[in-house]
Amino acid sequence: MKNSFLPSGLALSLFSLAMQAHAAGGHHAVDDAALLDVGKCKVEGWVERETGGARTLQHAGAGCRVGPVELGLNLDKEKQTTLDAATSFGPQIKWAFSLNDVLSVGAVASAKFNSQAPRYASSTLVLPLSWRATDTLSAHINWGRNFLRGGVGQPRGGVSFEWAPISDLSLVAERFREAANNSTRIGARYALTPDVKLDISRARGLHAGGVSWWTAGVIWEFDR
């Protein structure tokens, strides 16, 4: 009788390859259904600037793979010309599972707290799905909801396509819904080294009077 079970080391390697095939994340609104490798951590940061300078956002985040999930912590500082700077922070947990060599699903839950009262601001649940169409093209779909303080909820989600014409460069296009507004984004990610990636993108709101903004960021992965 033919043995249908893969050796554990080979199975783990195939699982890791399938998960690595999906690579969005970072500052992009549409998340991927992928986790850090076992034993890996990351730190990331990015800066957003609205065209005309009416709004800026500084983000710092860190995360580590812990068993079957990825645990993270986010810190944001947002400044608008007519308001004082607002600082928020919150934890995040992410789970992902490879259905086969081209499809992965997951779940991401996070919470946001203000540095000043009222502390609790919102929580979010997102269900990502990633599909590796070819060796160079991937698609990501998100369904989710924001649960705002006071019981008000907002749907969120989107779809993105990621194309890697060469091994060190990927191009991303996405359409997404956040904070009751629809927006689009195009961007590029360059791998400076296997563990350090640089991001740049431009996004634009699709609603009447929608503004545009630029984002530049960096992601560094390292062994724990």
What is the role of each PLM region?
Residues 1-27, 224:
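Cleavable N-terminal export/targeting peptides
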